[in-house]
Swiss-Prot record:
Gene coding for it: psiE
Stored Pfam families: PsiE (PF06146)
Keywords: Cell inner membrane, Cell membrane, Membrane, Transmembrane, Transmembrane helix
Subcellular location: Cell inner membrane
Family of the protein in this entry: Belongs to the PsiE family.
Protein name in the entry: Protein PsiE
Keyword Cytoplasm appears in the UniProt entry: no
UniProt GO cellular component terms: plasma membrane
Membrane topology field: Multi-pass membrane protein
Length: 136
């Protein structure tokens, strides 16, 4: 098998990068639609007088922030020269674990492990923002 020339490798990389960009753009548009649906769902839950609706409202708010953070991550990807900053993934992880704490608190061990995971992610965020690991 003949080795590929540098220009062909760059062409393949460009094609794959464009496919990735198109996929992320499509995902961003789908998330915007879901964000709109969640807005309507939150408005419905806000005006329902039942106690269960308050629980749904809080859960919906956290899901709303997850959609919002994923959209912000995709926007940041395109604005920062096709690069995903690590801290955005950490923010999404923290929000997802907070959602788990609110929604799924069946066992006491989970109630202890979820905040420990958040602490680990906050330490990770602190390390990523320190001068030693900061990227220019």
């Amino acid at each position: 098998m003949m080795p590929l020339s540098r220009s062909r490798l760059e062409f393949i990389a460009t094609i794959l990068q464009n496919v990735l960009n198109l996929g992320l753009l499509t995902l961003g548009l789908i998330l915007v639609v879901f964000l709109g649906k969640e807005t309507v769902h939150l408005a419905d839950a806000l005006f329902v007088p039942e106690q269960a609706s308050k629980y749904e409202l809080v859960e919906g708010l956290v899901i709303y922030f997850l959609y919002f953070e994923f959209i912000a991550l995709i926007v940041k990807y395109f604005k920062s020269g096709l690069h995903f900053p690590l801290r955005y993934f950490v923010y999404i992880g923290i929000t997802a674990i907070v959602r788990l704490i609110i929604v799924d608190h069946k066992t006491p061990m989970d109630v202890l492990l979820y905040p420990a995971a958040i602490l680990l992610l906050v330490i990770t965020l602190w390390l990523c923002n320190s001068n030693r690991l900061r990227r220019e």
